[in-house]
């Protein structure tokens, strides 16, 4: 560190940020808004993006327009407009306008009216946190359904020119690229909105999704090629450095200036400075310098996935790869290339798991093929766009090699996806696992300093030791120290989704659907499962056929995200309901066995977990789907929980007459907290201590009804509403239980 003062400065900065981060974690506590209020605002445009269905502009220097000001006619402000103004002063603002809105130039001042919202916060474990994502960009509010009131002031010529160039190039890729346009727009322009979701997922599964972002790799390839070309053609060090530095800075700004691009640009500028002043470029010092600059300006990026992966990848190249090469006397360029990929993979896997919960076994192999070909993809893509300004046909011809290379990428990803082990779902590691993992890597460096390189006679034992070291790293990440039973009532909006996990690895999922959240399986259920390292459900139990209980489960059955299902369990009722036939057919296509659940049947696990069906009786015919709902009693030691689906009052009273119910600890209140279910008589028999009500914010049914909440309170039962608290999680050892809520419940086992 004495030879690298910038590395020491970076280390001290990181230490200081970690020490003071706890005190700053609640900085946004004063940014809460009471609801979705209509407001009028003014600010300066610093960024513009054209999306498929909207025009998005980003404002800074925000202020609330008071009634009576120019441009505020026909608009009203909320009573607490002054408070909003104070909050917005600390925030940038994203405004979503109609797609047909006239272009608003960067640098101008805009007055707009719309609905002020907070970005969606994660309410379930594993769910993507839009609030945190936008906070890393300095954005704490979004103005939705907006309309412009006035545009004034001069625009920023440089930024507007770069943004217009980006939009023009994007349209040119559409003209020459056809189905491949989205790839080049992502790779060269940083615009991912036109990339098909299926292809994004495919590249991620193959472990090569990093090439779809403007990353350090792109800046390095383009910047180094430009600088070397200028030097080769007689340009001096200073002139070549200034030209290439300015052009790469302009390119980074044009493509959105993401954190990875910032890191690469800063390191590139350090490299150019070394060239100009005749100094030796040090990779780690350049990395540390870029970290200090970025974190000083935006300390919230310390927890950003792009920041962490970008810096760790270069750290792996600058430390782990040369260490391994030195220990084993590796000089072969091909082997060094493999070591580079392996070093990046080893050092970034824990962070990838922290954010994405899964990894790819074949990412390293695919990258060995994909990365050497990437310069050709970028070159032919850029050439096609450039020639396309002269002739579309000629541009298409120039673009052709790029098309076939992208097809090769797709073929490789599909091949990898078809192989066993293509998707390893390990879940989010715990903090102690991260410390142990990186502690072992630090121990490797310490051991290398003490013992040095292997001699020829010690290479075989050294290789065996290396294999043992990798096995130790893997063991740390897969180690599971959980115990007991975990029940999670997911926040799926207006719907139901319940996960039951035992410490022996058995997992059952009850229902899974929503009438208020789109693609609830993809965005809430599947991320939750992956967060806990769940890639297989022993049973998927659907209580009845309403869409708010099955549409997310249908996504699971379709199997696009690699979640295996041991058995689909449907209610054993007398009905010709088409929805059950559809589910049976879909399960048959996926080779998933289907079983039918009726009263008296049970699932018994060796660890003591028991699921007993109380309703419906075999062949039961109800007046509605809700009346068909499977009612399940869970037992684990002395702990009891009751799941009631959308059971209606008539069936509830019928089961009371049959004396089917007994005392429970936790109740899943029927039908999202409807007025007539969960009667006084039912509560007197079951006497639950806690009732979980799964319902959506502002739902049109008025769930949960005040009458129900009153009944629960009078019965001495605490109510937990997912719309207010997020996911509700119960963890029990079979005797006592703890209950916690939110995206990071304290009851993690």
Short names for language-model regions:
Residues 4-30, 473-478:
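Transmembrane alpha-helices and immediately adjacent membrane-cytoplasm interface residues
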Residues 567-569, 652-726:
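Cap/insert and terminal regions of metallo-dependent hydrolase folds
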Residues 8-10, 143, 197-364, 380, ...:
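Hydrophobic alpha-helical transmembrane segments in multi-pass membrane proteins
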Residues 192, 295-303, 414-539, 588-666, ...:
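Core dinuclear metal-dependent hydrolase active-site scaffold
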Residues 16-210, 523-527, 536, 581-605, ...:
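Membrane-interface helix/helix-cap signal primarily in integral membrane proteins
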Residues 136-267, 272, 346, 488, ...:
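Aromatic-rich juxtamembrane segments at the membrane interface
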Residues 537-548, 573, 667-671:
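Metallo-beta-lactamase
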Residues 150-160, 205, 353-369, 381-438, ...:
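Membrane-interface amphipathic/re-entrant loop segments adjacent to transmembrane helices
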């Amino acid at each position: 560190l004495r030879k690298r003062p910038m590395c020491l400065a970076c280390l001290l900065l990181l230490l200081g940020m970690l020490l003071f981060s706890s005190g700053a974690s609640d900085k946004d506590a004063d940014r809460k808004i009471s609801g979705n209020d209509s407001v009028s605002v003014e600010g300066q445009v610093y960024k513009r993006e054209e999306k498929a269905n909207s025009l998005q502009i980003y404002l800074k220097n925000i202020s609330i327009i008071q009634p009576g000001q120019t441009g505020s006619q026909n608009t009203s402000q909320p009573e607490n407009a002054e408070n909003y103004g104070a909050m917005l002063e600390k925030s940038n603002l994203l405004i979503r306008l109609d797609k047909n809105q006239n272009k608003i130039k960067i640098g101008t001042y805009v007055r707009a009216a719309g609905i002020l919202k907070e970005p969606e916060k994660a309410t379930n474990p594993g769910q993507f946190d839009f609030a945190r994502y936008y906070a890393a960009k300095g954005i704490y509010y979004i103005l939705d359904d907006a309309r412009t009131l006035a545009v004034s002031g001069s625009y920023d010529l440089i930024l507007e020119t770069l943004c217009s160039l980006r939009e023009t190039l994007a349209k040119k890729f559409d003209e020459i690229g056809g189905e491949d346009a989205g790839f080049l727009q992502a790779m060269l322009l940083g615009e991912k909105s036109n990339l098909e979701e299926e292809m994004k997922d495919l590249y991620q599964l193959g472990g090569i999704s990093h090439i779809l972002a403007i990353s350090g790799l792109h800046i390095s390839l383009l910047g180094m090629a430009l600088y070397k070309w200028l030097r080769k053609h007689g340009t001096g060090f200073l002139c070549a450095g200034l030209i290439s530095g300015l052009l790469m800075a302009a390119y980074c700004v044009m493509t959105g200036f993401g954190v990875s691009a910032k890191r690469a640009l800063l390191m590139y500028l350090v490299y150019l400075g070394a060239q100009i002043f005749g100094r030796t470029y040090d990779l780690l010092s350049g990395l540390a310098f870029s970290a200090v600059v970025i974190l000083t300006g935006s300390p919230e990026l310390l927890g950003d996935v792009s920041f962490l992966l970008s810096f760790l990848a270069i750290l792996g190249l600058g430390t782990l790869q040369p260490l391994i090469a030195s220990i084993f006397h590796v000089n072969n360029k091909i082997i060094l290339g493999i070591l580079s990929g392996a070093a990046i993979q080893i050092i970034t896997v824990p962070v990838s798991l922290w954010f994405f919960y899964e990894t790819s076994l074949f990412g390293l192999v695919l990258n060995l093929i994909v990365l050497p070909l990437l310069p050709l993809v970028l070159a032919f893509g850029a050439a096609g766009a450039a020639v396309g300004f002269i002739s579309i046909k000629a541009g298409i011809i120039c673009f052709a090699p790029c098309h076939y290379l992208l097809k090769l990428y797709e073929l490789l990803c599909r091949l990898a996806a078809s192989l066993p082990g293509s998707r390893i779902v390990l879940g989010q590691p715990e903090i102690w696992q991260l410390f142990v993992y990186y502690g072992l890597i630090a121990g490797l460096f310490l051991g290398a300093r003490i013992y040095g390189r292997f001699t020829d006679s010690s290479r075989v034992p050294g290789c065996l030791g290396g294999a043992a070291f990798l096995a130790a790293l893997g063991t740390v990440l897969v180690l599971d120290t959980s115990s007991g039973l975990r029940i999670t009532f997911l926040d799926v909006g207006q719907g139901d989704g319940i996960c039951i996990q035992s410490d022996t690895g058995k997992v059952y999922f009850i229902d899974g659907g929503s009438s208020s959240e789109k693609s609830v399986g993809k965005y809430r259920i599947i991320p939750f499962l992956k967060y806990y390292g769940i890639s297989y459900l022993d049973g998927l139990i659907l209580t009845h056929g309403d869409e708010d209980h099955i549409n997310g489960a249908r996504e699971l059955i379709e199997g696009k995200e690699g979640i295996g299902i041991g058995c689909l369990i449907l209610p054993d009722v007398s009905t010709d309901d088409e929805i059950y036939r559809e589910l049976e057919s879909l399960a048959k296509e996926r080779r998933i066995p289907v079983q039918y659940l009726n009263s008296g049947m049970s699932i018994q696990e060796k660890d003591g977990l028991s699921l007993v069906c109380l309703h419906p009786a075999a062949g039961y015919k109800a007046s509605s789907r809700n009346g068909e709902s499977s009612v399940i009693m869970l037992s684990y030691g002395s702990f009891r929980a009751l799941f009631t689906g959308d059971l209606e009052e008539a069936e509830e009273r019928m089961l009371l007459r049959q004396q089917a119910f007994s005392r429970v600890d936790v109740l899943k209140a029927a039908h999202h907290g409807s007025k007539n279910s969960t009667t006084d008589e039912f509560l007197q028999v079951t006497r639950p201590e806690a009732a979980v009500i799964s319902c959506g914010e502002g739902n049109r049914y008025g769930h949960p009804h005040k009458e129900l909440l009153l009944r629960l309170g009078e019965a001495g039962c605490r109510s937990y509403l997912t719309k207010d608290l997020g996911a509700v999680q119960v963890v029990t050892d079979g005797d006592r239980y703890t209950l916690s809520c939110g995206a990071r419940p304290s009851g993690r086992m």
